[in-house]
From Swiss-Prot:
Disulfide pairings: none
Subunit: Part of the 30S ribosomal subunit. Contacts proteins S8 and S17. May interact with IF1 in the 30S initiation complex.
Domain of life: Bacteria
Organism per entry: Rhizobium leguminosarum bv. trifolii (strain WSM2304)
Claim: tRNA-binding is one of the keywords in the record: yes
InterPro entries for the chain: NA-bd_OB-fold (IPR012340), Ribosomal_uS12 (IPR006032), Ribosomal_uS12_bac (IPR005679)
Name assigned to this protein: Small ribosomal subunit protein uS12
GO biological process: translation
Protein encoded by which gene: rpsL
SUPFAM superfamilies named in the record: Nucleic acid-binding proteins (SSF50249)
Lineage summary: Bacteria, Pseudomonadati, Pseudomonadota, Alphaproteobacteria, Hyphomicrobiales
Similarity field: Belongs to the universal ribosomal protein uS12 family.
Molecular function in Gene Ontology: rRNA binding; structural constituent of ribosome; tRNA binding
Length: 123
């Protein structure tokens, strides 16, 4: 434990919290345009072809966003909305594309957790 004199010489430093989603600039969502839509493979224990898109945001940031759900209609120049939230087994993917908003269609034939995938209530 430091002495009073030591604390006067060098005060305690506040713990600096690093922002996990800097491209959002404290906003809940941001709009952007897809510059490239492709698949990538996850880290070691997992195996799949995960669908991701490189997105140029309205604030000039270029980020990689994950496309959740089965099947999608995204291509280059699609306008999308992103939210924060990383994908644990894809390095560098710190954002999710919101389904059912702007050019992104909702997931077809989705019965449960529909709001997360932009699916309308089945008749």
């Amino acid at each position: 434990m430091p002495t009073v004199n030591q604390l006067i010489r060098k005060p305690r430093q506040a713990n600096v919290k690093r922002n996990k989603v800097p491209a959002l600039q404290e906003n809940p969502q941001k709009r952007g345009v897809c510059t490239r839509v492709y698949t990538t493979t996850p880290k070691k224990p997992n195996s799949a072809l995960r669908k991701v898109a490189k997105i140029r945001l309205t604030n000039g940031f270029e980020v990689i966003g994950y496309i959740p759900g089965e099947g999608h209609n995204l291509q280059e120049h699609s306008v999308v909305m992103i939210r924060g939230g990383r994908v644990k087994d894809l390095p560098g993917v710190r954002y999710h594309i919101i389904r059912g908003v702007l050019d992104t269609q909702g997931v077809k034939n989705r019965k449960q957790r529909r709001s997360k995938y932009g699916a309308k209530r089945p008749k």
